[in-house]
Amino acid sequence: MTSGPRAVDHKAPRVDGKFLNVENRRFLVKGVTYGTFAPDGDGIQFPPPARVAQDFALMAAASVNTVRTYTVPPVGVLDAAIEHGLRVMVGLEWPQHIPFLDDPELVRRIRQGAVATVRRLASHPAALLFAVGNEIPPGIVRWHGARRIERFLRELYEEIKTAAPDSLLTYVNFPPTEYLDLDCFDVCSFNVYLHRDADLRAYLARLQHIAGHKPLLLAEAGCDSVREGLDGQARITAMHLRAAFTEGACGAVAYSWTDEWWRGGGPVNDWAFGLVDEARNPKPALAAVRNIFADAPFPASERAGWPKVSVVVCAYNAADTIDDCLTSLASLTYPSVEVIVVNDGSRDATGSIARGHPDVRVIDAPKGGLSAARNVGLAAATGEIVAYTDADVRVDADWLTYLVQPMLVADVAGAGGPNVVPHDDPWLAQCVARAPGGPTHVMLDDRIAEHVPGCNMAFRRDALLSIDGFNPVYLRAGDDVDICWRLQAKGLRVGFAPAALVWHHHRGSVRAFWRQQVGYGEAETWLDAHHSEKFLGGQMLWHGRIYSPLPFLRSAAGRRVNTGVWGTAAFPSIYSTQTHRWQFLPHSPLWMAASLVLLIAGITGELMGMDAPWLLLSTGETMEVNAPLLLLAAGLLGCTTTLGRCATFAWRSDLSGLPGIGRWSRAQSRPAYRALIAWLHLVQPVGRFRGNLRGLSLSQGVASQHVTRHPWKTPVPAFRDARAAARLLTGGGTERSFWSESHAFRTTLLTELVGVLRAARPAQVVHVDEGWRQDRDLSLTIGRWGWLHVQTLVEDHEKGSSLFRTRARLRPSFLATVQALTVALLVAAGTSVSIAFHGHSASMFVSIVGITAIAARAAWQATRAVAVVDRAVARVATAAGMLPLPLAPAPRVSHPAETTLSETTLSRG
């Protein structure tokens, strides 16, 4: 990490992934705040030039490279900064502490002043970035509403960018208003003051997800020496800065340089945040900050102890991109790394290009697919950690530095990071990057991932070997999902490193995008065969949150914000609302096919003779209905809903920074961008469905990885199973108990129980609770309408004996509730029609028979599930040397809200 040199030929600073780049070099912000100062006779709120020069010289000696101001500095201050090798984060002051949006004239002046200031200072070599606002008070945000504030700041950003397109802009937020959606800005900046290291690091991890693919800047950090003491100030300020750098921020700014502080019309004398006092005498905090800045982001002594990493690149016909990939790997700053290229039977020049890099080990392997190639690299790796990336990826120089951090500081078996499309990719690839279906991460919380993409992941070598590496059945995709789920099934966790970013070249044509989605669809089918508990009705069930900037996914991920009583919470609570798959229904192939069928039927209806009268069911009176017109309207509604949503997502896609297409300008190119993005939204689910069908044709070669050594046939239910099922269906439960003269480990028994259930034939869909529910350990699906939840307990008794207890409860899913209501309506409608034609007796008989058949099928499925669980529990307990105790029914428990709320989640996973 380097500071910017004194500029001769000025090049505008730019965003470089999760960091900043100045003069074509990585620039890690090591800053201090400067001001605000008392205004002089001319209203300038900066010290005299001699004092400014003295301050800047002391800053440079303390390894500071950035000065943050809260008022617009005179050009002389910027000149002094560049003379001392400093950059300036320029703050634009305006009256944000009053309801400014209530005064249109004030809003106009704010915009004009901001645009004029940035246009005037943008070309100065000292200008690093511009802060267009700082901590709009929560009361003002509540007064105007968050959406109006967001819209104002977004429009202000766009106006300034139009006037100075190369300038970097940020808005400095703070925790009370963290819920503001300000992803348009180039840098995500936050002022944060937390005095416990664990709390600060946890909050920085959260802020990294708010920042997304943008750099995160800790814009203020430090503490008051009056209240914490001089040594306390030094310790806490150093902790703040160290945490920011090691958590992957693009920099940190210490608040403040001096105790000289003027605010609200007068000096502030009861706070002392300065690294130096008013007379510029250094405090202990200055030496602490100097040491942190000199070692940032990680001390050399710490880096020397990091483990060796083997980077494996699997390549097939990658001659177009492999050189760029290996060149970027050669620039890694990680201290101990080896690079292995597995040439997976390429027919082009991939192997020879890779051999042109002398520090790269190339292994030629017969074409066996992606997973097989990953296993070849795993076998050849000598590092303690094995990192994987793709041949069409360009890595950041500090990629490995941050990717290994979760494995160094937390109990995780692996880690992954984000991937973004390079800015220099062609326009078709830029559109593909804004379409659904691309690789992204799924987070269980701010640090633990459920899935990380295969182009950016690393694992401990021994963890991969413990599960026999990658499953070679995954030829092109799905291997990353499979490996994460298999590690989690063993109780291991996968971390996330937000600063370990790679640039991933996306498909450069619609045809290539289609082939990719078909491949993903195949992999989904095979994943369903391997991990049936992770699917419901053919749909993949994620417990975590899919992090993506795409409007397609963000539109479905609602949230609720609790800002505390009267908006006074220092750290608001933000809750993600549940996303149900019904929200994606208009994008499903079934919806599209049904809409087309209805549309075609409506158009051709007259030719097919669809002119018979329909019945008004509520009265039984005949009512003439134009059937073709009704079908046409239904088909048009379905098609326009799908097309409208695709167009909406394309319209809401972020096109900032994209170049013009050919000879077209940026403005002229936007319709073409949006049209193609909308088309990709339309074809993506169709491609996945095509892949699902192809995967089914190969499913016989996909054996479940959860089969134990002793498969067993599910039993024929007995009378006692029917009685137990009856108790379950009427709201009760069942319980079994087993006695052991020795201590029994509950986790061991549960692991065996899951294995036995998954070994049953026919196969059972078993969902293992991963910490989200306290009232169940595992669940067995009952058809598609319900769950049989099983909870276990091991009681410790005298002399090392123990009692193993299991109990089961039946709960219908949300989907079952909807289906039941639908069936009831259909039966009622059918009965009405039947009565009109055949009379009451026959109609009632048919209705009763139909309802009885449905109920009997549900009862049979419940009985069979009870029998399977009962026998499986008995097998596990007997194998552990336990003796069964007499059967006893569990007490009835009323759960009035579970079907409507909690089971909405269960129906998804």
Tell what function each PLM region has.
Residues 328, 343-352, 393:
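A conserved acidic beta->alpha catalytic loop
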Residues 142, 147-247, 274-276:
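Extracellular glycoside hydrolase catalytic/binding regions
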Residues 255-305:
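Aromatic-rich peripheral "rim/lid" segments of glycoside hydrolase catalytic domains that contact
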Residues 394-429, 493, 505:
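Conserved donor NDP-sugar-binding/catalytic core segment of glycosyltransferases
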Residues 21-188:
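Active-site mouth of glycoside hydrolases
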Residues 327-336:
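Short, acidic, metal-binding catalytic loop of nucleotide-sugar glycosyltransferases
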Residues 386:
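Short aromatic/hydrophobic "clamp" motif used to bind/position activated sugar donors
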Residues 417-418, 432-450, 465:
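Short, flexible, basic/aromatic active-site loop/helix in glycosyltransferases
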